Amino acid sequence: MKKIVRSSCLVTLLAAWLLPLNIFAAEGPESLLHGEMEAINHNFRLVNRQYTDPAQKASTLRLIAEMQTHAEKARTLTPPRAGKLAGDDQTKYVNTFHKDLAALIKEMGALQQAVAADKVDVAKAEIDKIAHLKDASHKELGVGDDHKHKGGPPPPGQ
């Protein structure tokens, strides 16, 4: 009986010790890029909520700087979908990804300047441009629809 208890305790301890290794092994290029993009999106939502509040100016500027850092890191990564393409299609896809990220980083810089200068209307315009860039890029690259609600009734006429 003691041998069975010891064996089951040993198996439990080994499983608990090895489980985190599974989690780290799943951290591949897709999840790295996804993590950077999620961080940009999270900070962008916070900026959108607080950019008009002068009391949160420093926080807003910090969030924008973090967005820029994440975007710069994302620019060094290859989108996972590019690995499924070959030749000219792959080159075109990666070039589009880099072009869209460069445009995003440029608009983040303009947003940072607008917030720093307390130009709320200009900041709002930059936020709108960034949101449009995100939507257009995601549509062009075929990404970003994973988190949308897919349930409910079909559109009329189907």
Identify what each model region corresponds to.
Residues F24-A65, P156-G157:
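Immediate post-signal-peptide N-terminus of mature secreted/exported proteins
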Residues R45-L61, L104-I127:
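Amphipathic, charged alpha-helical scaffolds that flank and support histidine-based chemistry
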Residues A74-T96, D145:
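Short, solvent-exposed, charged loop/turn and helix-capping segments
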Residues A110-Q158:
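C-terminal amphipathic alpha-helix
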Residues G35, A39-H42, L46, R62, ...:
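Charged, amphipathic alpha-helical oligomerization/scaffolding segments
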Residues V11-L13, I23-F24:
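Cleavable N-terminal signal peptides
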Residues M1-T12:
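Bacterial N-terminal signal peptides that target proteins for export
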